[in-house]
Amino acid sequence: EDAFPVTSCDCPDCRAACLNSPGWFMPEQIPALAEHLGVSVEKLFRGKLAVGVTCMPDGQQVHGVMPHKLRDGKKAGTVWTLLELADPGRCVFFDRGKCTIYKFRPYECARMMHDRPDEAVNLRHRIVPRWTTAALKEYGELVKGNLSTHQPNKKRRP
């Protein structure tokens, strides 16, 4: 049984998340979303997605892919810093109070736990290991940058 069951987005708290901080996809979800939208993964990434970053308990900053946040004129297909992610921004797929990709929404969004903050952190930590070097490779090439994966037992740099 999945420790993080799929939930409905039919409450104000879930919709508030769509206006602040979009959830992360699992790597295998992105090709399925691209196919559903009839575009290549590259076109989807450059037009609707972004690389997000999260900070692990050991201090490592690691990357994963999320919907682009509409804010400050920042372009899709780029990397968001922790500071940028701290400011609210509407998910590119949230329109007129609804998720336009509901059936294909990010893993994290489908399991939103706004009422259980500790579990929400555990949910993100479940997603992070799926963003391996291989899973991030294509997106790293598209943003022309080095993206970080979580490396347990790696010592934090001072």
Spans of features found by a protein language model:
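Short loop/turn segments that flank or connect secondary-structure elements
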Residues: 1-158
